Amino acid sequence: MNRITKSKEMPVYLFHQGTNAHAWELLGAHRQLNGKTSFCTWAPHAAAVSVVGDFNGWDAGAHPMTRLNDQGLWGVTVEETHDYDCYKYRIITGDGRTLYKADPFAYHTQTPPENASKVYRLGGYRWHDADWMTKRTGKDARSLPVNIYELHIGSWRRNEDGSYYSYRQLAGALPGYLTEMGYTHVELLPPTEYPFDGSWGYQVTGYYAPSSRYGTPH
């Protein structure tokens, strides 16, 4: 993203008004089918911003970002990227400090304690819940029983070697347990990315990134 196009003018306006409920479509890293990735971040007090990562050898001068407006949006398009490329924003502050920051709008990240963001294209996922969606049609949810099971993915169950269950393993093991115990719904403790393994995930560092402890977004 090297400039604000006509189609982006309203999303940008709403973002600065604090009313853009789809800001993730504007900011972050958006990888296209041709391998290009558009990066956009908000750093209103920065003197300069660049994106550094696996795709440019972490070279601070390879991909400087353009300040897109007076409110502090910065953007750049990188020509050749791959899924899982790690990256950060290199920010020069107004007082001359150099900071390396992860992308708060990233879809995927390194597994903590590493904290770089990762390029990841979300498209192409195939859902397999058509039968369940069909059965749900016509039912009045307000008249059905509700029994909610609150679950922290990392501590509910682990493999024999102590490693975390993956999202796939959880999907295989959890429904039968819930049915046996009489639960109708699941409330996940924060499944988004967070830094400290000893917590339940409330120190969120990536609201758009499912925790990489348990697998990829797909």
Predicted feature residues:
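The feature marks proteins involved in alpha-glucan
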Residues: 1-38, 68-150, 155-162, 169
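Short proline/glycine-enriched turn/loop motifs at strand-loop junctions of beta-rich domains
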Residues: 42-49
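Short beta-strand elements bearing conserved aromatic residues within extracellular beta-rich modules
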Residues: 49-51, 87
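Short, surface-exposed loop motifs enriched in S/T, G, D/E and P with embedded aromatic residues
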Residues: 61-68
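Short amphipathic alpha-helices and their capping/turn segments at secondary-structure boundaries
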Residues: 135-138, 171-182
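Aromatic-lined carbohydrate-binding/catalytic grooves of carbohydrate-active enzymes
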Residues: 161, 165, 176-218
